[in-house]
Amino acid sequence: MQQFDLLGIGNSVVDVLYEVDEEFITNNKLEKDVMTIIDEEKAENFYSKLKQGIEVAGGSVANSTVGFASLSGKPAFIGKIKNDNLGKSFSKSLSNAGVFFKTEPIIDGPGTARSFIFVTPDAQRTMNTYIGACSLLSPKDMDEKIIKNSKITFLEGYVWEEDLAKESLVKAAEIARKAGNKVALTLSDPFCVKKHRLEFKELIKKNIDILFANEFEAKELCQTQDLEESAKEISNMIEIVAITRSEKGAKIYNAKEAVEIKAKVFNKVKDTTGAGDLFAAGFLYGLTKKFSILKSGNIASITAGEIISHFGARPKTNLAYLIQKELTE
């Protein structure tokens, strides 16, 4: 019997959230609604100049594992931190949420990663991320026993920045598939896709069963402005592709069908940070329970809807209870 339902492999990041206006984005020459990699100097500059932000343990796939745990699933996570205060905070947050996390921290070198997330009044988020210790994730960190004993291994596209990290993801995917398990990938960000498009396509063709992308990432991957065209191309490569479209919901494709998923909104949309992460959590949870792509997609819509109703990318409601309530009404 497998020990874990889901293993996430991704960046171990502490999010620092700020509510800002459009003028702040313009004045600081930030590229809105994407993730930009920054160096340690710029990260320290943000820390020293800005008022106290809301600090929450984050990281895209790490957020997904926390959401998965809240759904009553059994998740694990692999990611690199430093043995510093932020690293200890990150590790504790995962453990408290019910996520198994035992990756060895580094003692010397760059600090634990942090992401400055600037949320504008339209609820869009602009991220400036210092990768820090995440850059040292290596194939040695890929725990073969955990990978073999996880139903689905979920890889984070953001990690595809360092050569060692690339080797790590490929190694994990190969171990998982040889063990007869599924491998999922989130493309993470349009800029990330633009930068690594050909490498991502090769990875998807060789090692991925389930792909998550928003409509901009899917179009960038396939070099087309036609969403259906990009979905068809991706569907020919893999088993399942889920394409999220913000307030328009999502479309999910497999070899047999394409299903439309309506967006679920609880109250007002306050912060879209983590919407894709929690969509993935809900969908993958459904797949581990052998639900259809339609039912899994509806669960995903509910979990994403919860996360955008408040600040931060970690659920504030017991998702298992919420799903039970929403699906029985």
Please describe what each predicted stretch is.
Residues 93-110:
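A glycine-rich helix N-cap at a beta->alpha junction
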Residues 152-232, 248-250:
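Conserved beta-alpha-beta core of the PfkB/ribokinase-like small-molecule kinase fold
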Residues 52-60, 105-109, 274:
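Active-site nucleophile and cofactor-binding loops and adjacent substrate-binding regions
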Residues 102-106, 117-163:
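Conserved phosphate-binding/catalytic loop of the ribokinase/pfkB sugar-kinase fold
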Residues 75, 101, 183-184, 241:
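Hydrophobic beta-strand scaffold residues
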Residues 1-7, 12, 26-32, 174-178, ...:
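Conserved phosphate-binding/catalytic region of the ribokinase-like
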Residues 1-78, 88-89:
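Glycine-rich phosphate/adenosyl-contacting loop at the front of the ribokinase-like
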